[in-house]
């Protein structure tokens, strides 16, 4: 018998808008989210304190508050252990903060077998809805498969309180989908890797909505579009069962920068934006590259290695090393298989084209 449908993991509740966090009590009262109405809240050690003061006024007094020092595997395991050993029997975990808190909480919730509600306070990357937790470990960092959040809340009032850089980074992150999708399609042609058409359509729609939007981070309409795009991008990974719709040569270059030059590493989305633009230029899609460069420039995002604080030779090192960060993944970098001297020439040409 033909398959009539397929099951797709997706959030039960999504709220995006100014003041959306005020709906959190009602969301947590939903029995699909929390059966008993007892929940723990994970926050960062820094800005999380002020967020606790803002949110605690509308939440029950018996909420358990837990701080997360950083997004490391050890801290995520420790968070799960502290919640498990708490006197109150919590049945839901709420993560309030940026990607680091949410990633640690996603991993902790998976260990505990709890649903997670993600309350994002910035728009730096698409991890808020993805089935992946990126955590620091002894080898540098690792990506861990976890269930996607059961609820997503993005309060644009809280987003506006974040440093602008943490919003702009999400623009670079979402534009990198266009590079990732081109790499996925390239792999399909060259290696026979299957492309999930629905996931690809979702990832492309997310990127195009930001690429074509004339507004900026000061516009509520643009923030709403960016928030929706990041949710859609994260969901595309859940549909595909892989990070392929959002991760290609762009993310390989990003991971290489993180590993080779950790003290110079910038925001994830900033590095992915530059990596995506370079890979698109390398692919020869110069029309799309010009569009991406214009959008990155308009939103005051990095475009060249020097904008990231890297010299040409350092960026060449990162591009040369990039394929080693994701063994088995086929992108334009693996396809061209350039020598270091060829990469050096390509980077010099890229800088000459896009330097401001």
Q: What role is predicted for each listed range?
A:
Residues 24, 48-52, 100-106, 125-128, ...:
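Short glycine/serine/threonine-rich phosphate/pyrophosphate-binding segments
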Residues 86-108, 112-121:
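A short, small-residue-rich loop immediately preceding and capping a beta-strand
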Residues 6-8, 33-34, 85-88, 109, ...:
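Solvent-exposed alpha-helices and their adjacent loops that cap or buttress functional pockets
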Residues 3, 7-8, 174, 285-356:
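C-terminal charged capping/lid subdomain of soluble metabolic enzymes
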Residues 1-92:
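ATP/NTP phosphate-donor binding region
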Residues 11-12, 110-206:
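A glycine/threonine-rich phosphate-anchoring loop and its flanking beta-alpha core
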Residues 197-306, 310:
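Active-site segments that bind and position negatively charged phosphate/pyrophosphate groups
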